Design a protein with these regions (language model features):
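Catalytic domains that recognize anionic headgroups
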Residues: 2-494, 499-502, 506-520, 524-527, ...
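Extracellular/secretory pathway and lumenal proteins
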Residues: 14, 508, 582, 677-679, ...
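Helix-start (N-cap) detector for alpha-helical repeat units in TPR-like alpha-solenoids
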Residues: 444, 478-479, 512-513, 546-547, ...
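Structural signature of tandem alpha-helical TPR/SEL1-like repeats
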Residues: 458-465, 490-503, 523-537, 557-570, ...
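Structural marker of alpha-solenoid helical repeat scaffolds
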Residues: 473, 507, 541, 574, ...
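TPR/TPR-like alpha-solenoid helical repeat scaffolds
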Residues: 655-659, 680-689
């Protein structure tokens, strides 16, 4: 497939002049439809920052996202590869393969300082996009989910821009002559639509636009900083979205399920650095986001590095209406076992390959309401041939097992962001028989999303009622009992959860997350032997399931602490940032009087957000036993700040002060311990352990 490229005359012909190495800024604003931006013709929204950037650069009027999901789309943007090439087609696979280099790695290799601030868990470093960045501020790693509210799986544009400016200022102060590559990701337009004031009032009735306007406003702070720092003119700035938002069109509420233009037509603006010889303009032909990475390198003057990427840049060459743009969605396939969708777009037509094919004349029918496929078989055949030629180079290999899916933590975070992300096994027989068209499964999909929302709102009856209806329509959908089991477990309905997880495993015997969930609830039901068996079954299916290692460790900690420590250590080797895991491992080491190991893991748990007085007390004792008395004092004082009535912390702090020779401070803490607990009044400080 030839990538649509841009004629130099579209920018305006001018002789390029030699230019110092430019700073490079990539801005991605999540979930923005092109037709909801002022410079793309939107009338009911104010986007002055993006409109100003458009006046200084080139607006690509038909930029097409290759996949309408945040993480897979950003993998395309940063690597210049199609989803079927890099393997990132949904949320259910593995992190980005290290074979695929990102532009950050190239810029770093070329001597650039590299930084990124992302605004949602869907771009957490665990997915693999942090490679090449000196600084990658995600703040949504697994540990924060374990110790903080689920709402912290994303953050507002204001906070992200503030973090970005902090890094930019620090970088400029330390290395003012070193060029930088910086990526800023803003998440606000993604649902739920909840803009702050005054945008909430100003955009009442269309809060999605309010989110875009708010993101634009905050982005203005970055542009102001660039101008005040005299960096704007000489910087290369590319702004685009990862995908759009359906807003109810074609029955889809948000995005990811279908690939109509409401979710794949995105804004793309390129502001070249001063001296590039490129003038502002507009380009009407379709272009792909695969072109962003090589364009960044070419406009930065790294033409040799540009050749490393499979796609062409947006510059040079010849663009014709016959250079189609590709899109796909495997969301319905991977999570539900329904047919995947593939599409090609030309300047006039949008062809969607599905069990019921679709063809739209996007010039005459921009809303894609009139399917021309039954009437224009010749056009469909031409585009289908082009599509198959592309896909034959990378044949699709579906998984026959759903066992090695995402962790429970990742699943929960994605559900909090509105995604249903499971890995459904599809047999060769099912493929041969033909998979359901997602269009015919829209009701079930929306019902599952509504049920997930109901469970997160603690409305268990509503969620259960919706899923019961889904199960009636499709009794083989194993996701239904799994979701019921997860919801019942959150509501501490252990018996119900056990029944649901077992039903799930009858439908999908390879699903290790259901095994882990069943193990967890069986512990609460007092069936520890059976719980251990299911945890081990999960690990046979997926040895990288750190949650199963953790569950097994919790079970074995009652009878065999050495075995439990081994289980916990295995879990830590896979996921070292799970705060409760670090806490429990540290406490086991403490019980075995291995104070050095105890201090390491308890300190990590504290770093990850566990703000618990007993933990800091044990940490202080561990520091004391390893002769790190200043740290012991610091930890014990923190324990007392959390709980001033924790007598043990006062006692241990007194002992630490005594060892430091601070007798007055020691007597004060001993006195407080005695006041709080009479039994401590009889202790001889000289013999305190």
């Amino acid at each position: 497939l030839a990538l649509p490229v841009l004629l130099a005359r579209c920018f305006g012909a001018a002789a390029p002049v030699r230019q110092p190495v430019p700073n490079v800024i990539l801005i991605t604003i999540d979930t923005v439809r092109a037709d909801h931006i002022g410079c793309y013709g939107a009338k009911n929204i104010q986007t002055p920052t993006l409109d100003a950037l458009a006046r200084d650069g080139t607006v690509f009027e038909r930029a097409i996202s290759q996949v309408p999901l945040t993480w897979p789309s950003h993998a395309v943007i940063l690597t210049g590869t199609y989803p079927f090439q890099n393997g990132v087609q949904d949320f259910t696979g593995q992190p980005l393969d290290e074979r695929f280099r990102s532009v950050a790695q190239v810029f770093k290799q070329q001597g650039y300082a590299t930084g990124a601030v992302v605004s949602a868990f869907v771009l957490d470093r665990s997915w693999g996009l942090a490679r090449g960045f000196d600084f990658y501020d995600d703040a949504f790693a697994a540990e924060t989910f374990q110790t903080k509210d689920i709402g912290l799986v994303d953050r507002k544009a204001g906070e992200s821009v503030t973090r970005a400016l902090k890094w930019l200022n620090k970088n400029r102060a330390h290395t003012p002559r070193r060029p930088f590559f910086f990526w800023l990701h803003l998440y606000d337009p993604h649902s739920p639509y909840d803009p702050p004031e005054p945008f909430r009032t100003q955009y009442r009735g269309h809060l999605y636009d309010g989110e875009i306007a708010y993101a634009d406003h905050e982005l203005g702070r970055l542009m102001a900083w660039l101008k005040q720092s005299r960096l704007y003119e000489g910087s290369l700035i590319i702004m685009l979205s990862d995908h759009g938002e359906s807003l109810g069109e074609h029955g889809e509420i948000e995005h990811g399920f279908f690939i109509y233009n409401s979710t794949v037509h995105i804004p793309l603006i390129v502001k070249p650095p001063a001296g590039s010889g490129l003038r502002p303009g507009r380009v009407a032909k379709p272009v792909e986001t695969t072109a962003v990475a090589p364009t960044l390198l070419r406009l930065a003057g790294l033409k040799g590095e540009e050749k490393e990427f499979q796609s062409s840049s947006l510059l040079g060459g010849t663009a014709t209406s016959e250079d189609p743009a590709y899109s796909e969605s495997f969301y319905s396939f991977s999570s539900f076992g329904w047919s995947p969708l593939h599409a090609l777009q030309t300047s006039r037509y949008h062809y969607i390959e599905a069990p019921t094919p679709e063809l739209y004349d996007v010039v005459a029918d921009p809303g894609e309401k009139n399917n021309l496929a039954p009437l224009q078989a010749a056009t469909v055949a031409v585009l289908e041939d082009k599509l198959q030629a592309l896909l034959r180079k990378n044949p699709f290999q579906p998984a026959e097992s759903a066992g090695a899916g995402l962790s429970a933590d990742a699943l929960e975070k994605l559900r909090a962001l509105g995604y249903v992300a499971y890995h459904t096994p599809v047999s060769p027989e099912a493929l041969a028989a033909g998979l359901p068209d997602p269009k015919s499964k829209l009701w079930e999909f929306n019902a599952i999303l509504e049920a997930s929302d109901a469970f997160h709102a603690s409305n268990f009856p509503a969620g259960e009622a919706l899923l019961s209806q889904v199960a009636e329509k499709d009794p083989q959908m194993y996701i239904v009992p799994f979701m019921l089991g997860e919801a019942a477990a959150r509501a501490q309905k252990w018996a119900e959860a056990s029944v649901a997880f077992q039903k799930c495993l009858q439908l999908n015997p390879t699903f290790d997350q259901a095994m882990t969930g069943l193990s967890r609830v069986l512990v609460y039901l007092g069936k520890t032997d059976e719980a251990a068996l299911w945890a081990r079954n999960a690990l046979k299916q997926n040895p990288a399931n750190y949650r199963a290692w953790y569950e097994l460790g919790l079970i074995e900690s009652k009878t065999d602490k050495n075995a439990a420590i081994a289980d916990y250590q295995k879990a830590v080797s896979i996921q070292g940032n799970l705060a409760p895991l670090r806490r429990d491992l540290g406490l086991l080491f403490f019980q075995q009087q291995n104070y050095a190991e105890a201090a390491e893991h308890l300190a990590k748990a504290a770093e990850l957000g566990v703000n618990d007085a007993p933990l800091y007390n044990f940490l202080g004792i561990s520091y004391g036993h390893t002769n790190r008395l200043p740290k012991a004092v610091e930890s014990l004082k923190h324990a007392i700040r959390i709980d001033p009535k924790l007598a043990e912390a006062h006692l241990n702090l007194g002992y630490a002060y005594q060892r430091l020779g601070q007798e007055s401070a020691a007597r004060k803490e001993y006195g407080e311990a005695c006041r709080l607990q009479e039994r401590f009044c009889q202790l001889d400080p000289a013999t305190h352990p």
